[in-house]
Amino acid sequence: MRLPVKIAIGCAIGLVVIIVFGFIAFPKMIKGKVKSMINLNKGSEIRQMFVKVPFALDFKIYMFNVTNPMDVQKGALPVLKEVGPFCFEEWKEKVDLDDNDDEDVMFYNPKDTFYKANGPGCLDGSQMITMAHPLILGMVNTVVRTKPGAISLISKAINSIYGNPDSIFMTASAMDILFDGVVIKCGVKDFAGKAVCSQLKEAPDLRHVDENDLAFSFIGPKNATPGKRFKVLRGVKESHDVGRILEYDNKKEMEVWPTKECNQYKGTDGTVFPPYLTKEEGLASYAPDLCRSLVAVYSGDTKYDGIPVRIYTATLGDMSKNADEKCYCPTPDTCLKKGMMDLFKCAGVPVYVSLPHFYESDESYVKGVVGLNPNKKDHGIQILFESTTGGPVKAAKRLQFNMPLEPNPKLPIFANLPNTVLPLFWVEEGVALNNTFTKPLKDLFKIMKIVKIAKWLIMLGCLGGLGAAGYLYFSKKGEANITPVHKVKPAENGVSTLGGEVNHAMSDNEIEKY
């Protein structure tokens, strides 16, 4: 077999092998291996991290101090000064675990525990904060919505419990407001005060200080307290379903919003996502505090610690314009403007949520107070997501809690209030994986990069070999075969020559015949 043919056959075989293995088999092998690893089956590494996150999340709180409370009582816009951060470690775990292998599901209750943390710029919590009293404002706004005829009773109760206050504002330390509790004096004897206090004593989020007094805080009741029960798919049978919520609080869908679509649980609880999500799918996660699933959308690509990742961002949408979000409107005829959501139907309290500093919200909210400076870097929601394994490598989830201010002539301390939305505080839940957790990802991508480079080099080599073999083959085929000419001497065996040429026609015996 000629050399060019041998080269061509060898290169063709090599080309087929590299196409089959490098471009088809190896990617499928990696994909299959990753899918087999990303599940919540008992004993899996992912489940261990899902059940108890092996590191603390950075939890920061920023509070808004109202610097002109008495002016606000007269109708002026609130002037705000941001105070913070107040820093905490947040440890996440799941408790009371149970599994159903036939359904490929697991059950759990989430539990978040907060510990005070120190760090650059972190405040100790002793700072005094002036803000609208959440209970006074909350009680009045709730009664106005649900039982407006009882407003005079509430007015008397406020005077009784809070000692005839001259404003809706209170001043307390940051730690008392956030965790330790602001005391509510419920040892009153009048009918209105006792009626309201009897309701407050049944509220699960208020701490009983003693027989009469209660204490209110924003985050204290949730600290180290198991939440309601989840039922999620483990992803053993189908990796694309890993972590997907099937039930929450023993319900297959919510009973909060007016449409079936908005009452659906979409996505996971935010601590695990399926591998190989497409950009178009987004990152869907259910937030129990909002009674809503939020979907972070793809917005670009970048690198984190050398790992290629996607950038996802999220907002609260615009219920006033988006048809799919009309279900979140407080009433069919009343929708909040862009970037704002009312939690009254969800939590039973008139609290509005937005992004910090009203970022990505209607401009009227920003102009309704003084002192805000919304910007993407500090106030947006951003997730850096590694799509192969389905893991966030860096994230900043931010949310601001607000309460509406509305004038009400039936209550003296509400009579001249401005009509605006007042920010109370905002939180940031952050995570950034260190080298301990990114190294396995970097090793995986290093192997994939080496294989990618090698397969292209081998393929180019094979194509080059085929080209060289073809050149050699056709070059040989075009050459002419020339036979060399040798001088012939006369024979010495009696053969005659005529005219100097050898006569091959007659031998000596033939001549003798004549």
Curated annotation (Swiss-Prot):
Q: Which PANTHER family match?
A: SCAVENGER RECEPTOR CLASS B TYPE-1 SR-B1 (PTHR11923), SENSORY NEURON MEMBRANE PROTEIN 1 (PTHR11923:SF69)
Source organism phylogeny: Eukaryota, Metazoa, Ecdysozoa, Arthropoda, Hexapoda
Mapped to this chain, the residue ranges on the Extracellular side of the membrane are 28-452
Q: Which GO terms describe its molecular function?
A: scavenger receptor activity
Can you tell me where the transmembrane regions are?
A: 7-27, 453-473
Task: Classify the protein's membrane topology as the record does.
Answer: Multi-pass membrane protein
**The protein, known as:** Sensory neuron membrane protein 1
Residue pairs linked by disulfide bridges in the UniProt entry: 262-327, 291-346, 329-335
Listed InterPro entries:
CD36_fam (IPR002159)
Intracellular or extracellular location(s): Cell membrane
Q: Sugar-bearing residues?
A: 65, 434
Protein family per UniProt:
Belongs to the CD36 family.
Q: Name one Pfam family in it.
A: CD36
Keywords, comma-separated and alphabetical: Cell membrane, Disulfide bond, Glycoprotein, Membrane, Olfaction, Receptor, Sensory transduction, Transmembrane, Transmembrane helix
The cellular component terms of Gene Ontology attached to this UniProt record, alphabetical and capped at eight, are: membrane; plasma membrane
What biological processes does GO assign it? sensory perception of smell
Would the keyword Ion transport be found if you checked this record's keyword annotation? no
Q: What is its main location?
A: membrane
Q: What role does it play? A: Plays an olfactory role that is not restricted to pheromone sensitivity.
Q: Which residues lie on this side of the membrane: Cytoplasmic?
A: 1-6, 474-514
